[in-house]
Amino acid sequence: MIKDQHHNVAGDGHDDHAQKPPFHATIITVFPEMFPGPLGLSTTGRALGRVWSLDTVDVKGFVTGPFGRVDDSPFGGGAGMVLRPDVVGQALDTGGGFQGRPCYYLSPRGQRFTQAHAVSLAKGNGVVLLCGRYEGLDQRVLDHYNIAEISMGDYVLSGGEIAAMAMLDACVRLLPGVMGNDDSGTEESFSAPLLEYPHYTRPAEWKGMDVPKVLRSGHHAAIKAWRKEQAERITRDRRPDLWEIYTSGTRPDCFVKDD
């Protein structure tokens, strides 16, 4: 008999019967104890249970038989083990459903996750994230459930959980009421094809280095111009690919926001 492996992650009095906030994330994973992890701290943690909610589905709970396991050796041979489609499929079927939310499988071969993805997801009612482990997931699961693959970058992690945390952090911080200044999200790197300008705070002098005078001038137009100039310089020096996009005047999908 398969026990209920669907667990709400606590957040400010949030319980199994409480009404979920507008943005709800479900993590399907072999290691549910990893959550909320850092998502339970700082701004995302303070908003958990109030602005957004999180639950996990433990894939291990859907193993059947005395010698059941979540993974098996790959057909055709090769290194590593592959997550079984029958076990993961059960987790997807009984884990609460997608409920109109998009579902992504965290994978290094997926489409690159961008700020535009975060903006788009933050406007919806949540997301379902399927975390891979071992050598990966049986392809039939992705095909049957029409699950899109998404990647956090050109590197390989031990599993999808850390990538899922990064993806959720990028989305949740854009939800209304999460950040103290709602303009913060629109002024950061990748909200436009420019990297962010430098930041300074008190003290005005530290180890012989002064805060640029323009930032202490109170002249808002001059400050805005200085910040744009710095953002352009940093982008040109560090990310020629973004600089080319910026100077061409085009805005590809990774920078386009839905109105």
Residue spans for each PLM region:
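N-terminal nucleotide/polyanion-binding subdomain common to many enzyme families
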Residues: 1-95, 220-244
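Hydrophobic/aromatic beta-strand patches that form the interior of the parallel beta-sheet core
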Residues: 26-28, 55-57, 102-104, 127-129, ...
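Fold-independent oxyanion-binding glycine-rich loops
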Residues: 30, 59, 106-109, 131-134, ...
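Short, solvent-exposed amphipathic alpha-helical segments in soluble enzyme
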Residues: 42-47, 119-123, 144-146
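S-adenosyl-L-methionine/SAH cofactor-binding core of RNA-modifying enzymes
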Residues: 83-133, 138-139
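Structured adenosyl-cofactor binding patch, chiefly the S-adenosyl-L-methionine
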Residues: 137, 141-190
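Long, charged alpha-helical interface segments
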Residues: 190-248, 252
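Oxyanion-binding "anion nests"
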Residues: 251-259
